[in-house]
Amino acid sequence: MSAPKHVIIIGASGYGRSILWMLREDSAYQKDWDIKGFLDNRADIEGLPDVPILGDPLSYKIEPGDIFINALGSPADRRTYTAPLREQDADFFILRKNLRLGERATIGLGCIFDDNVSISVDAQIGRFVTILGSSIIGHGVKIGEFCHIGNFVFCGGDAVIGNDVVIHPHATILPRVKIGDGAIIGAGSVVVANVPAGVTVFGNPAKRFEFK
């Protein structure tokens, strides 16, 4: 029997603590793995009495049995704070609470799937993607790396989502729509046409949006 893993959560603020709660509800908790602590370098963030902050994710040296989960919402932050750990060949946890995964669908290393996410057949989910509760990913959808998809999002069949994309809650991506790298989809938007890389869209139908 292999030794249990020691889970380290990157990010000790609100979402990190939500991830801690989800991990503790998992049936494998304290059987296959335990919780070692948080990694966080923000001076105003404190650990919990039973879950300390172990150090800075940019300088932490991996110890035997460590396995990591990235609880940072921003794709840019997720890239930044996983990079030094990936350079050390860190192992990353896949959290999949009540995930419904279709035939031939694939999911990448370090993904987080909140409660009741549904991924249909032949979908491909890249590394370090976060998909929050009750979102539906249609058949053949391709999602790149480090994306963040909010609650109650629907991605229609064969849509293509680039890397580092943020899709806010209750958005709908119509079938076969392509969304470029780094695009942002506003809450409640209905995306009926392709979205270029780095563009923010909002509304129904979704149109280019700029903060003034």
Regions found by a protein language model. Name each.
Residues I9-I10, L39, A71:
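Short hydrophobic segments within beta-strands
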Residues Y15, D44, K207:
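Conserved Rossmann-like nucleotide-cofactor binding loop
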Residues L23-S27, L85:
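Active-site catalytic pocket residues across diverse enzymes, especially alpha/beta-hydrolases
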Residues D26-E46:
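NAD(P)-binding Rossmann-fold cofactor-contacting core
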Residues A43-L101:
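Phosphate-bearing ligand-interacting subdomains
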Residues I94-F209:
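Structural signal for interior beta-strand "rungs" in well-ordered beta-sheet cores
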